[in-house]
Amino acid sequence: MHLAFVIDPDRLVQDGAALQRLAVALVSDGVRVRRVLPAARDDAPLSRLIPASTYDFDGSPLFRASRLGTLSSELEEDRPDAFVSFGARAFEAAAELARDLDAGLVAMVSSARELDATPLRRHADRLDLVGASTGPVALRAARQVGDELATVLPLGVATPDGGRTPPPPAEGIAIAGPGRDDGAYRAVFSAIASLMPSMPDLQVAIELPAGHDPGLWALARELRVQRVLNGVTSLESIRPLALACGVMALPEAVGGTRSIVLEAMAMGRCVVAMEDAMADHLIDGVTALVAGERDARVWGSLLSAGLRNPEVASRIGAEASVRTAARFGSARCAAQLAQACETVVRGPAIPFPGAAASDA
């Protein structure tokens, strides 16, 4: 079987490491993989062994057909059996290529926001399957494309080896999120301010991606927490440091999954998150500490428990690690994707559990 992964810039930044592991796992199992990537990228050594083509996702729409035509001609010589898209913009390109080369089409979706931005209905006649990262996202997809075309099919992440203990957590917080909800960040910053007097070494890494609220720094100055904040464009750019933090905080709902959060859970880190109806893997008191409201006292209590209560943090982290490995382990997810694509390419019937199925 020959698969083409079409990966747009947003998903490459967010899930680059997970996608690399997925491709390597599939190749090691005898699946041929070609990647279609943004022109500017920095491949890891193992990824360089996997064939790649480039596509300008950010180019002018006027020349889009020409760019796709050139890519289609390149792929014609070694035609993939199916295109697997990662990201809304990638799906558009994958759908056109699948139509042109008469190949299967699978959309991998990590969040409700990404799902809503993906033009599934426009290419419904070509679409074979939507693989959603969680049960609620799969149910949402099923309302667009039908139950028979939506299933739970997450992108896996690395999990610690059985004999290796993750390094002990540092006295730090990694804040993941788009930085757009002023009320959510006010609650979190206020909670951090309440911790600072008793935690003089506390450091916080905070994402400030494109489109974040420019007033966040003013808010940080107002609440006097700016001296402990360290802004980065993405936690992925400082992955080792982010995963070393004792707590990963999600002030805003992710609306599904995010690889670096799953990696933190797999390592036994304590996740403190805003309530998220699309994230069925974040179970309050079991795999995470979940805040039901944007309240500084609530967040202060949860962050304090994650950083200063070893019994709570270790219990949550241990359960999160076990469940994340069982549900989102990269080897398991690679095997699921291979089986799904094999069915798309060869099958007549699709023996998928459907959108209603989700592991606890």
Name each model-derived stretch:
Residues 270-274:
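Short hydrophobic beta-strand element within catalytic cores of glycosyltransferases
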Residues 243-256, 269:
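Acidic donor-binding loop of glycosyltransferase active sites
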Residues 120, 124-150, 159:
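A short, active-site helix/loop in glycosyltransferases that binds the activated sugar's phosphate group
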Residues 233-235, 240-245:
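Short alpha-helical donor nucleotide-sugar binding micro-motif in glycosyltransferases
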Residues 284-285, 289-296, 305-311:
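Conserved acidic donor-binding segment of nucleotide-sugar-dependent glycosyltransferases
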Residues 85-90, 109:
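Short His-centered aromatic/hydrophobic patch
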Residues 305, 312-327, 333:
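A short, well-ordered alpha-helix in the C-terminal region of glycosyltransferases
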Residues 214-234:
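Nucleotide-activated donor-binding/catalytic signature segment of Leloir-type glycosyltransferases, i.e.
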